[in-house]
Amino acid sequence: MAKKVTGYLKLQVPAGAANPSPPIGPALGQRGLNIMEFCKNFNAQTQKEEKNTPIPVVITIYADRSFTFEMKTPPMSFFLKQAAKIQSGSKLPGRDVAGKVSSAQVREIAERKMKDLNCDSIESAMRMVEGSARSMGLQVEG
């Protein structure tokens, strides 16, 4: 028989930098979960990732206070900022251009994000990436 799920918790944790300090400690602690177990497992699974890459995590909490977690790919905005070599997007998207990304970079980002996106083809994933780029004030070339 399957364990009874009591809830889900969504966090964005830097790769290899999970520790019991806020925001992770309080979020897990108030639900009665073992904080150090999560931190050790998460850091072990993200050691191949570049340090401080934000990794979205969905933690499934069970009635017996055990948990499992599923890691997603980093946010699209993180990849777009890396590709454009900028710190943040435009304050006025549509008016100010914060940077430029090529269609090859858009395709690469779409291929990396494909498993987390709700689309069937790489072309539709590319359109989603282009839309995110435009909403950040990035110009898509090509």
UniProtKB/Swiss-Prot annotation:
Has UniProt tagged this entry with the keyword Lipid metabolism? no
Keyword Hydrolase assigned:
no
What would be one Gene Ontology cellular-component term for the protein? cytosolic large ribosomal subunit
PTM note says: One or more lysine residues are methylated.
What Gene3D superfamilies does this protein's entry cite? Answer: Ribosomal protein L11, C-terminal domain (1.10.10.250), Ribosomal protein L11/L12, N-terminal domain (3.30.1550.10)
Q: What molecular function does GO assign, one term?
A: structural constituent of ribosome
Q: What single Pfam family name could you report for this chain, choosing any that match?
A: Ribosomal_L11_N
Q: Which UniProt keywords apply?
A: Methylation, Ribonucleoprotein, Ribosomal protein, RNA-binding, rRNA-binding
Disulfide bridge positions per record:
none
GO BP terms in the entry: translation
Provide the function of this protein: Forms part of the ribosomal stalk which helps the ribosome interact with GTP-bound translation factors.
Recorded family membership: Belongs to the universal ribosomal protein uL11 family.
| Oligomer status and interactors | Part of the ribosomal stalk of the 50S ribosomal subunit. Interacts with L10 and the large rRNA to form the base of the stalk. L10 forms an elongated spine to which L12 dimers bind in a sequential fashion forming a multimeric L10(L12)X complex.
Q: Which NCBIfam families match?
A: L11_bact
Which protein, by its recorded name, is this? Large ribosomal subunit protein uL11
Originating organism: Rhodopseudomonas palustris (strain BisA53)
Gene responsible for this protein: rplK
